[in-house]
Amino acid sequence: MENRFFKKIVGGTNEYERTPIPAESLKGRKSFLGMYAGEHTAGTEFVIGPLFVAHGVTASDLILGLLIGNLLAVLSWGLITGPIATSKRLTLYYQLERIAGKNLVRWYNLVNALMFCFLAGSMIAVSATAVGIPFDLEMPTLSDWLPRTPGWIVTVLVMGAVITLVAIQGYNQVSKFANIMSPWMILIFIAAAIVGLAQLGVRSAESLISVAQEVIWNGVPLAGMSKFTIWHIIFFSWFCNMAMHIGMSDLTILRYAKSWKYGFYTFVGVYLGHFVAWIASGILYAVFLQANSGSQEFAPGQIAYQTLGIAGAVCVVIAGWTTANPTIYRAGLALQGIFPKVPTWKITAIVGGITSLAACFPALVMKLLDFVALYGLLLMPMGAVIFADFYFSENGLPARRSIEFEIGFQLACFAELGIDSGFLFGIKSALRGGNFLPRTPRLVCGCCHFRNCVQNEVSDL
């Protein structure tokens, strides 16, 4: 009975985990416009926008930093990830397995899946802050690491179960859900900004500039928070999705695209989500701080509800949902690379359970900026290996892929990963929080892979 129920849900889902996407399964532009708009106009926006306010960024630094950083992110998706995805039409995980060997990629896939679980978990927690409003749940604060009440745990687990139910149905359902929800959420964010500005006393263009500079983004961090500058904003907006574009995780999504140019459609997500929505949620947080002076409570649901009422709370629920859905889907595909004989939907269901448990801990939300930086630092190096392998082979340098020589553990790739990660964390430690400096190590990693290819080619002469 139970198996029949799940078979009915997942149907004949085929996610092509180890084969190229056939032509009849390719998706048009609408699918990607909706999914990226939904994913990036989502739960993280209700966290990141307020955290910029808390870190004391100025209004001018925020606007200019977001314009530059988001442009760099779109170019990374369009010029790096898109061409590789539509050329190979394979998942990130299977491509890495072919290059680096099954045994090495198993460890990478495990780390990748855990990172995705934690990110999706933070979004489930964001949704739970809104679901808990009618039940008067005690909400987490900026310093909380552990859940405060059993009610919070129950709310999170229920949200996680519902979100997982959509994710196990595969890419089609994930994309369909985002297409339905994203237009409404975008309008809610815009409405939030307008209503919030009115509550802060904005009546004209002059008062808008004054309120933005003196009330919302006044350049003064909250107690216990570090100071952010324009460089933090540029590099964070560029690299907050580094694992997706430079780290190549979105090969898994863009392999369905009819054209490599669909990678540029991410502009809909990043400029609506990582520009409009971050600004709007920052305005909401400023309204919340004005009404609750000195409050350390940090609950996106409460923040949105105070300004927009029920519509704001519902938007937070849906926003967390539209981010968690594709993230759990990606995590399921990562683990499917470790357990290739297990159906993806079963693995995704297990991932959803792990994610829901992780979501019970508010620290995932409170430390989201740090987590996103760590997430990118850990997952980016293997993207450099795929990038180097693709472009070197395209330019006549034969690639030494593990699958061709039946190598289970490509030592050179492991060394590249170790050198790159060590260099990254060395910089981060030396600068005490320099989380946005991964470009140089990516070059180091690519050069290491190039050297390995040349060395192997010479040894065959």
Provide a role label for each language-model segment.
Residues 1-61, 196, 218, 222-235, ...:
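Membrane-interface "cap" regions at the ends of multi-pass membrane proteins
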Residues 36, 109, 137-169, 183-193, ...:
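Transmembrane alpha-helical segments of multi-pass small-molecule transport proteins
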Residues 54-56, 83, 99, 107, ...:
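Membrane-water interface regions at transmembrane-helix termini and the short interhelical loops
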Residues 67-100, 109-124, 288, 454-460:
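Juxtamembrane transmembrane-helix boundary signature
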Residues 105-144, 321-337:
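Hydrophobic transmembrane alpha-helices that form the core helical bundles
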Residues 124, 128-133, 186-220, 235, ...:
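Hydrophobic alpha-helical segments and their helix-loop junctions in multi-pass secondary transporters
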Residues 158-210, 264-270, 371-384, 441-446:
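Membrane-interface loop-to-helix entry segments
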Residues 384-461:
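C-terminal membrane-solvent junction of multi-pass transporters and transport-like membrane proteins
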